[in-house]
């Protein structure tokens, strides 16, 4: 009987350790560290002349607020998937991101390395997206706007 109790305790501990492991998102990959709001602070080791905020949600969706090609913020939404350390995404209109990104999240910094012929390195920092940017951002465009990702 004593050995059955010891076995039960060992099994419960094993189950607890497995249950407390890193959480994976609904479509794979480690989204826990990525979840939250980010602001672009460096683009190819230089301060960007444009603004990009991204809110990565733990359910695999995102909202991106960019002031790249216009004076106003543009809102792009969609879904993302992480496979290993590579993130890819699709916009709400069904178009894919320009490329995939190898990602690294450490101490509130997200580094994204584009997987294209000439790699671009983007550095983001955790932030709170200002409410006025969220309120101002528009999905209505007078001209064709190219999304940042």
Locate the predicted segments by residue:
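Repetitive helical segments and hydrophobic/amphipathic motifs
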Residues: 11-14
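C-terminal motif of bacterial Sec signal peptides marking the signal peptidase cleavage site
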Residues: 16-19
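Lipid interaction determinants
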Residues: 21-76, 83-149
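A ubiquitous, low-specificity "background" feature that marks scattered single residues
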Residues: 8-9, 36
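Bacterial N-terminal signal peptides that target proteins for export
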Residues: 1-8
């Amino acid at each position: 009987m004593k050995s059955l109790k010891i076995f039960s305790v060992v099994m419960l501990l094993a189950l607890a350790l497995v249950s407390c492991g890193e959480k994976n998102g609904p479509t794979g990959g480690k989204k826990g560290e990525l979840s939250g709001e980010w602001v672009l602070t460096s683009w190819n080791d230089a301060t960007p002349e444009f603004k990009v905020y991204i809110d990565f949600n733990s359910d695999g969706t995102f909202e991106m607020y960019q002031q790249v090609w216009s004076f106003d913020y543009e809102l792009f939404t969609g879904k993302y998937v992480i496979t290993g350390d590579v993130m890819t995404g699709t916009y709400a209109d069904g178009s894919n991101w320009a490329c995939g990104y190898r990602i690294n999240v450490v101490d509130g910094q997200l580094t994204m390395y584009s997987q294209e012929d000439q790699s671009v390195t983007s550095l983001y920092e955790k932030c709170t997206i200002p409410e006025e940017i969220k309120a101002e951002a528009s999905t209505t465009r007078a001209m064709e706007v190219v999304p940042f990702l």
